[in-house]
Amino acid sequence: MGYKPKYAASSRKREPDVIRTKPEPEKKPSRPKKAQSKAGRIFQIILTVILVPVCTFASVRLLGWMLETVGRPKAAPVAKIKNMGALDDFDAYVEQAMSQADSGLKVSHLGLTEQTEPTQEETEPVRQHYTIPADALVAPKPNPSCYGQVVSPAEMEPILKNAKWILDGQKTYFQTNQQIYEDSFIRYYLDDSIFAVTWQEVHDDSVYTFSEIKVEDASQFRRHLADGQYGSDTQYLTTEMAETVNAVVASAGDFYRFRNFGAVVYQGEARRVEGTYAETCYIDRNGDMHFTRGGEVLTTQAVQDYVDEHDINFSLAFGPILVDNYELVEHTWYGVGEITEGYARAALCQMDSLHYIVVTANTTGPHQSIPTVAQFAKNIAATGCRMAYCLDGGQTASIVMNNDLVNRPVYGQQRKISDIIYFATAVPEGGTDNG
């Protein structure tokens, strides 16, 4: 028997070796590179052109100083750097370079080339404050170029932007998405002392004409009596009186000569008191509205005391009160104005300081309804006004802008009346075109 090695190969065929390779790691999807902004690219250039030489210069200076100190005995004091002026120059250079880098970054961010950030004086020019003298019988003439007219509320956006300084942070009821009466126009006026915009809306199938006004000075909110004096029996159209006194916007007043009703105050003097149930509106010399209710002031002296206490300029005697301190006022009875019946209406509203709306409600075109006082008050309160008061309605209810009648009075024509309220420019003849 032959010798067989202990580890002799088996007769079983050997399977070929399998070459195993490590699985390739799964590659995560790379994130797309974020596009670098213009400011970022400029900042990189600034780093390369300015900061790299600065750092190189600093490194060389530091290396030179280290070489000077090599081999110096430990106990030896470190010598004072001889040329301190060079380091001062270096510090100044670095400070200047950093300042230039910061300025360059600001310029690139603003998309400017040679301009720096505008100063407050450049963006908000100082404006002169105008006032109408107390003894002036008429106001300055408006500048014709300051009037304008558009069809779409959106077209008023640049006008509202230019009026921001005179609005002084106050919001307007008029908005660029306002729903206006079909086929109507939006009229406006803007100069250095007054902004006014007039338009029409439809509410409860009545056409409401709004004129929103913001003035710079209380002297621009005025009352005019026919012939410029108390007690005149002469009567004029609203458009005629508005043109006489150079009104930007005017509204019929309380028709004081037609009714012996309420307290009449003109030029700070109590003239007449009649009708114990009357609610009276007073305008003080700051341009703010005040109210008295029926029975609160019953004599001329009592009215004069009220005038002196509140520094009242003039009054309006019709009513009733619609909104008092943002609260809707309800009435079940009032002596004038047929409050529970449909009637053409007019009102004066105060939105904020030196900020007003005059409004009428009439029938126009297919819209042939006219409101009760309750309906009228509801729509007036929706403007967000602080105070609101009914003026004489019916055929008297009229609003005039640029000497043109804007609304459609009863029977389609104005009535001759004895007084108006109006808003005027205070800029001396000619005004300033800010439109």
Predicted features and spans:
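Zymogen propeptides
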Residues: 2-3, 15-275, 279-280
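Beta-strand-turn-beta hairpins that frame and shape the catalytic cleft
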Residues: 206, 218, 288, 350-357
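Active-site-adjacent helix-turn-beta-strand microarchitecture at beta-sheet edges
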Residues: 251-333
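A short, polar/proline- and glycine-enriched secondary-structure boundary/capping micro-motif
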Residues: 232-235, 299-306, 367-374
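Proline-rich, Ser/Thr-phosphoregulated intrinsically disordered regulatory regions in large mammalian
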Residues: 3, 8-10
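Conserved, well-ordered active-site substructure
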Residues: 261-283, 331-386, 390-391, 396-435
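Short, solvent-exposed aromatic-acidic interface loops
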Residues: 226-231, 296-298, 361-365
